[in-house]
């Protein structure tokens, strides 16, 4: 925008606001307003005709290109999964020769159709789209003139408001008289300019509308016959398609069902089609803990063999001798979940502070539920570290209470069995059907015996129900209070 245009826009801004809010005196011409409305419709419909014609031509060409790509994809699907050609001498062919041949024939027909329809599609571009674009250029020039007329209308209304303001003064001064004459001259000039553009548009817009009707009529007829020719060519070529692989005489749904057979049932029988990512991650984590923790660095056996937590002056004889004190180390600690509360308070055969600290350090890396693996506690490393009881303790009854910090490897296997708690059970909240091998199925309300579980209910637990052992999601059950 030039500086002159900018100054005019600034001077017209107040009148634009008045016109928008219907304030002050405004010039109206119903005849031009009706012509302006029809002109806007003409502009919109011409744009729509041009865009839709171009979209139709592009869509037909794109459809044929898509069908060629579809035929190529079907050829790849019919080939074996290795991507290599099958052995023609094989008893059972790995690929589908009939399907590949049908795809190649269909691709050839569509490619030929695309070449045949190229002149018709080019004709749509030449006879419909190009004339519409030329008409839009003419409409753009007329739109500029209509904008010019609207600007002159704003100037006329602005000068009329100024003239009326000075004319209504009851006691005008000399300067007011001078401003009145100046405003009157501006009104006369603005009126002449506005009348010129307004009369020009009112006179010539109806002529444009009549010419537009004569212009659109042949375009519509041409576009109709072009589409008819394109559809007729498509219908005839596809109707005469001689591909034995396709049965065009039978019902399409029946043919599809007959060729599909029991493929859907065979696919549903595959395990990978029912794969659940969340369950598989939890199972993988549980498998790692179950089978990989025995050799891990934090297991009780590895901790004892490495000697972590033992002092330099460790004495095995002292570690195995019972202490005559009351409850020994850890008696004030809260009762461990693995100990029966009714037997608490009897004398405990716990070693010295050094031995207790050592056993606690070794048991810190233990995994609950895995201590039956340490039945061979009479091995030399464990005996030397004080984990074997004295002969007097082995001959007499096992102690009624075992220190939680030294469980599960602080005593002999007999002591571990005696300290085992009651069977922990859970009640099923929902029905669960096994999703894979190793899962445990159960109905809602079933009481399941816990073999191994974790504190997190969102992980998989191991249980036993109806003589079967397997894993199940922890959030499907509720722990029973003993």
Swiss-Prot record:
Residues 17-254 form the BAR domain. It holds the Pfam family SH3_1. The keyword Coiled coil applies. There is a cross-link at residues 242, 481 (Glycyl lysine isopeptide (Lys-Gly) (interchain with G-Cter in ubiquitin)). Residues 382-407 are annotated as: Disordered. PANTHER family: BRIDGING INTEGRATOR 3 (PTHR47174), REDUCED VIABILITY UPON STARVATION PROTEIN 167 (PTHR47174:SF1). One of its GO terms (cellular component) is mating projection tip. Component of a cytoskeletal structure that is required for the formation of endocytic vesicles at the plasma membrane level. Could be implicated in cytoskeletal reorganization in response to environmental stresses and could act in the budding site selection mechanism. Binds to actin. Interacts with ABP1, GYL1, GYP5, PCL2 and YBR108W. It is found in: Cytoplasm, Cytoskeleton. Signal peptide: none annotated. Residues 421-482 form the SH3 domain. It comes from Saccharomyces cerevisiae (strain ATCC 204508 / S288c) (Baker's yeast). GO terms for molecular function: actin binding; calmodulin binding; cytoskeletal protein binding; identical protein binding; protein homodimerization activity. Residues 31-64, 174-204 form a coiled coil. SMART domains: BAR, SH3. One of its GO terms (biological process) is regulation of endocytosis. The gene is RVS167. Phosphorylated redundantly by cyclin-dependent kinase PHO85 in association with PCL1,2-type cyclins or by MAP kinase FUS3. Phosphorylation inhibits interaction with complexes involved in actin cytoskeleton function. Keywords: Acetylation, Actin-binding, Coiled coil, Cytoplasm, Cytoskeleton, Isopeptide bond, Phosphoprotein, SH3 domain, Ubl conjugation. This is Reduced viability upon starvation protein 167. Present with 14600 molecules/cell in log phase SD medium.
